[in-house]
Amino acid sequence: MSLFSTSLWTTTVMSIIVGLYMLFHNSGESFDFGSFLLDTSPYTWGLLGIASCVAFGIIGAAWGIFICGTSILGGAVKAPRIKTKNLISIIFCEVVAIYSLIIAIVFSAKINDINPAGFYTKSHYYTGFALFWGGITVGLCNLICGVCVGITGSSAALADAQDASLFVKVLVVEIFGSVLGLFGLIVGLLIGGKASDFS
C-alpha cells in the first residue's frame, strides 16, 4: 500500500472509532459539524476559496508544463524543428493559471472591510460559502485542464517529431482540452455573480 492510501484509511478508521466512542458515551452532541460551519468566519471560507483557486490552478499549469516540456525536450533531440512550434502547448498550460488568477481577482473584489458586530448574517455566510465552493470548483477544473493540456501537448510534440502533418490534428484535441479550464472559469463567474459583496 502507498503512503497516501495508508494515511487515508488510518484517518477514516480513527474518525469512525472516535465518532462511535462519542456516540456510545452520550457525548455525540459535542461532535457538531453544523456549529463548525457556522462558527467559522465567512471571511475564512471566502479567502480559503480564493487561495485554493489560485493554488490548484498554478499546480495544474506547472504540472502541464512539466509533462509537455519534457516531451518537447526529448523529441527535439531527434527532430530539432519541433521546439519552437510546440511552444504553443506551453502557452496553453500558462493560460490555465491565468484563468485562476482572473477568478481570484473577481472573488477578491467581494471582500470588503465591515463591522464585526453584524457580520454573521445569512448573506455573509452565502457569500463565504459561494466563494469557497466557487474557488474549489475553478481550481479543480484548472488542475484537470492543466494536466489534460500537458498530456495532449506531449502527444503533439512526439507526433510532430515523427510526422509533421500530425501537429495540427493533435493541436485541435489540445484546444478542446483547454476548454475545460474555460468551463471552470464560467462556472466560477456564475457562482461568484450570485454572491453579494461583504458589506
Swiss-Prot record:
Predominant location: membrane
A Pfam match: ATP-synt_C
Residue intervals on the Vacuolar side: 1-3, 68-86, 152-170
Any Gene Ontology biological process: vacuolar acidification
Signal peptide location: none
One GO MF term: proton-transporting ATPase activity, rotational mechanism
A GO cellular component annotation in the UniProt record: endoplasmic reticulum
Site (Essential for proton translocation): E94
Cytoplasmic compartment segments: 25-46, 108-130, 192-199
Keywords: Hydrogen ion transport, Ion transport, Membrane, Transmembrane, Transmembrane helix, Transport, Vacuole
SUPFAM superfamilies xref list: F1F0 ATP synthase subunit C (SSF81333)
Membrane topology: Multi-pass membrane protein
Disulfide bond residue pairs: none
InterPro entries, alphabetized: ATPase_proteolipid_c-like_dom (IPR002379), ATPase_proteolipid_csu (IPR000245), F/V-ATP_Csub_sf (IPR035921)
Subcellular location: Vacuole membrane
Taxonomy, superkingdom: Eukaryota
Transmembrane helix is among the record's keywords: yes
Transmembrane segment boundaries: 4-24, 47-67, 87-107, 131-151, 171-191
Similarity-based family: Belongs to the V-ATPase proteolipid subunit family.
Subunit structure: V-ATPase is a heteromultimeric enzyme composed of a peripheral catalytic V1 complex (components A to H) attached to an integral membrane V0 proton pore complex (components: a, c, c', c'', d, e, f and VOA1). The decameric c-ring forms the proton-conducting pore, and is composed of eight proteolipid subunits c, one subunit c' and one subunit c''.
Function (record text): Proton-conducting pore forming subunit of the V0 complex of vacuolar(H+)-ATPase (V-ATPase), a multisubunit enzyme composed of a peripheral complex (V1) that hydrolyzes ATP and a membrane integral complex (V0) that translocates protons. V-ATPase is responsible for acidifying and maintaining the pH of intracellular compartments.
Listed name of the protein: Probable V-type proton ATPase 20 kDa proteolipid subunit
Origin species: Schizosaccharomyces pombe (strain 972 / ATCC 24843)
